[in-house]
Amino acid sequence: MSNSFSFQRQNPGSPLQQHSPIHNINTGGNSNSVSNQSNNHPQTPGHHVPSRKPSIVEMLSSPPPLPNTPDQEDIHSFSLSRNTSVSSRASSIYGNVNGGTSKGSIVGVDWAEIPLVELTESNKLVSINSGFSVQKAFETLMEHNLTSVPVSLSKTDSTDLTNCLTFDYSDVNTYLLLIMNKINLNDLSIYEGGDDVLSNQQKDSITKSINKAKKGEEVPVDFIVKLHPKNPFVKFSEQDTLYKAMESLGNGVHRVAITNMNGTKITGILSQRRLIKYMWENARRFPSLDFYINSTLQDLKIGSNNPITIYEDQLLIEALLKMFTERVTSLAVVDKTMALIGNISIVDVKNVTSSKNSHLLFKSVLGFIGYNLTQKGIEEGQDQFPIFHVNNQSSLGRVIAKLVATKSHRLWVVENRGSVHHGSVSSTSSSNSNSNSKSVTQSPKASPSTIESTLNQSVSTPSNVQNIPPGSEPGGLPGKLVGVVTLTDILGLFASSKSNKKIDPQFARNQRRRSSTSTTRSSFEGSSAGQDLFRKSYTTSAPAKTEGKR
């Protein structure tokens, strides 16, 4: 049996994304290791010698310096972004006005009291209307290098966001699974204007839209965004304080809307990823963060010891289905010994939307990771391997630096090498980032050598992951997976430090899971090559294969 996937081919015209200096580690055969890159080498006469860049260990040691400070030109100063963000410059002004400066030092500012207007992006908010096709909505994500886009329920005015849903890669995944007959109407949580029970007419309309999609015909985006459970569309005024947004995002909402004072117009979207970047770039301005940034994950007791995983030899389609059923956006890829091999994200679904790549759906997850890294090497001219793991002795500051640099939502926690008797993560971590954070005893900063060792483990992993056999020597893999730490955990920790309220990082995810078993749903949740999406016919059957146990 075969189904047609219908999206037209588009030209890869989106601009290349700028990467921060430590977004990826070059692991090509002709490249020096991280430690070699930071060493001094004899200069060759007649050759231009570029200025020395700070090593990765230096870059992960502390937050970037504030702008306009005397040490700005110091060789160890750095910024995780090539250009200071608008919000960072605004907060600099805000800090100077409220705290003042003296001999280059900034008087501490309470981040919780900063108005959200300081974080509003100055660039135009991208949105679409519900009359867009799923294809056009997908192209919008690709063109603007977004992970989500607001969908106005107005059929004509995409800027009218007083009532809107959102379209993201979870919706693309749902669309794909529907077409592949991996999920059906009973697996979905249909949102139809708040009705508790769908009428027969509504069910017929939904069934017709699903059948049209399977035939390769275009369907409106408002159809697909109503099929995947999401969190409430949370709005805050520009005059609300940062604490309010931090509390919401710390409870697991992926992004919130910022409106004008009258609440009549959305002026920006604040995501978890953007907020953590803002907090990192301005960390020196917020003395209340010092204790947390210098403490280890083990001491802070944040993160979860139950990461959701997929085995390396399971099919990619199984991984996509697991992300749908578990309502998560990422899976850790492990071998049979629970050694961490890699990571697969919901955004990766874009790489199988082309008919020429449909065969990857029935290939192993490990093979798909290898394909992704190969493509990234082709696009950027080098083999690359992202740093996606930490250990419990990593300081929170270095964890945040990695999250910002890799633009990730989570990092996998692996067992410390050489710490066989270290104990399980359950004794050091909690799924609740609240964990009485105020009573945590401060620990010394993690030594650079520990982090350097962790980074060197990443570098030692071959860029072509397909060449790693399941039973390979442990030295070739980061280590045994014992947990995961997310943006939600960290933002929840910051929020709980300012109040006695319970911050539950699992709140939003549990809400999505509950809504997936009902007939109603709330509406809002919280990379870069053009491809044709689901245009040609491909089979939904696959060779018989035994599913790996989890």
UniProtKB/Swiss-Prot annotation:
GO molecular function (one): protein serine/threonine phosphatase inhibitor activity
Classification via SMART domains: CBS
Record's GO cellular component terms: cytoplasm; nucleus
Keywords noted in UniProt: CBS domain, Cytoplasm, Nucleus, Repeat
Amino-acid biosynthesis among keywords: no
Family in the record: Belongs to the SDS23 family.
One GO process term, biological-process aspect: cellular response to glucose starvation
Record InterPro entries: AMPK_gamma/SDS23_families, CBS_dom, CBS_dom_sf, Ssd23
Biased composition annotated in UniProt, kind: Polar residues: 1-23, 444-469
Protein name: Protein SDS23
Matching CDD domains: CBS_pair_SF
Chain intervals with Low complexity compositional bias: 24-40, 421-443
